[in-house]
Regions:
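Active-site microenvironment for binding and transforming phosphate-containing groups
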Residues: 1-245
């Protein structure tokens, strides 16, 4: 992965998490997974973290336990959303765990909680504020719906943001309805037929007043160590996780 000089890898037994050392110093843990180091069989090989894509549930649960162990959070207090490509927010409170409802933005001020989103081309966005952290699932529909701006509003003053691995314009040709929707929101379009969710998320963050933004250079379709729905169709999901420390 290529993020910034402060990003580093942790993990063992083939599992690798990318984290940010500066974030840890500021009291937030953030972790990005790829597809390596799990127990799922093809086409979900191997660190699939999604239970609703056709994989065996016990394997998904083991994969989540492995990630939690490597990252140092309690999987019993992991909160996820049923992602619907919109902009609905759910605040995760002490004691919330599992699938907490339909949303594409999760925010928490609870130090016992870990929040997570799952992706396979959409851009995962981490937002950090004073005593609060949020995650945004930013696919093209969510970007057009204003999910990033909604996440910023839910966080309050955003001190820093991270945009994780997503599909890039090189691999993401879309139809005219997507191009029209992006242009209507002043989101970037490449060559009149391609979009980049990560770059669009960064533009939306800047428009919402966020100044400190780290953006991954990884294209999930180009890099086969990541799950990509556009490239593979039926496949698994990598995860992005955040917790207050």
């Amino acid at each position: 992965m290529s993020f910034s000089p402060s990003m580093s890898e942790v993990g063992a037994d083939g599992l690798r998490l990318v984290t940010d050392e500066r974030a840890a110093e500021r009291g937030i843990g953030i972790f990005f997974t790829d597809r390596r180091g799990g127990v799922s069989a093809a086409p979900f090989d191997s660190l699939n973290l999604a239970a609703r894509v056709g994989d065996e549930v016990d394997r998904v649960e083991e994969n989540r336990r492995r990630v939690a162990g490597a990252a140092g959070f309690d999987v019993a207090y992991l909160a996820l959303a049923r992602q619907v490509h919109g902009a609905r927010v759910i605040e995760v409170r002490d004691g919330d765990a599992g699938v907490v409802g339909e949303a594409d933005v999760l925010v928490t001020r609870a130090r016992a909680a870990t929040i997570g989103i799952l992706t396979a081309d959409c851009a995962p966005v981490v937002l950090w504020g004073d005593g609060v952290v949020a995650l945004v699932h930013a696919g093209w529909r969510g970007l057009v719906a204003g999910a990033v701006e909604t996440g910023v509003a839910a966080t309050g003053k955003v001190n820093a943001a991270w945009v994780g691995p997503s599909i890039h314009a090189c691999c993401y040709e879309v139809g005219p309805e997507v191009i029209d929707a992006f242009e209507g929101r002043n989101l970037p379009v490449a060559d009149g037929a391609h979009v980049d969710p990560g770059r669009a998320a960064a533009v939306a963050l800047q428009g919402a007043g966020v100044e400190a933004i780290v953006v991954s250079e990884v294209c999930t379709s180009c890099d086969r160590s990541y799950f990509s729905h556009r490239r593979d169709g039926v496949t698994g999901r990598q995860g992005t996780f955040a917790t207050l420390t």
